[in-house]
Regions:
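Flexible assembly/topogenesis modules
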Residues: 1-137
Length: 137
């Protein structure tokens, strides 16, 4: 690698729409829509703050709007019912998640989409110092 190159080159590839479905139902009321050619992507940029719990807080994520358009096109979604607004656990739930992406033009080559997820879980230790966990949920 080279220190002069960006290892996290997340190009937008003229992405125009992002939809997330949970168990067949669309997650947000309307999809994230972008138009990078006309610099209309602030809603998608704001998703980074809402999806990481930084929205309406006096802290940033180190990315500017120009960074977002120029190679840091990351999208974040909080799929918890309470938007991770509390120190409690949510009810266990199993289901399906579907990500629909719409591009303004056909892609010239295959691209990779990276999906990163965080899950709540409870680790317990008993008096014999055995660790009990359940990662299947």
């Amino acid at each position: 690698g080279s220190y002069n190159l960006n290892p996290f080159n997340f190009e937008h590839f003229n992405l125009t729409q992002v939809k997330i479905y949970l168990d067949g139902q669309q997650h947000n009321i309307k999809p994230l829509e972008t138009d990078f050619a006309n610099h209309l992507y602030v809603t998608a940029f704001t998703s980074l703050f809402a999806g990481t719990g930084k929205l309406y807080k006096d802290e940033g994520n180190g990315l500017t709007r120009e960074d977002f358009e120029g190679g840091y096109a990351l999208y974040a979604f909080d799929l918890t019912p309470d938007l991770a607004d509390g120190g409690h656990f949510n009810l266990l739930k199993q289901g399906n998640v579907r990500l629909d992406l719409k591009f303004g033009a056909a892609l010239e080559s295959t691209i990779n989409v990276i999906a990163y997820a965080e899950f709540e879980n409870c680790l317990e230790d008993d008096r014999s110092r055995n660790i009990i966990f359940d990662y299947k949920n």
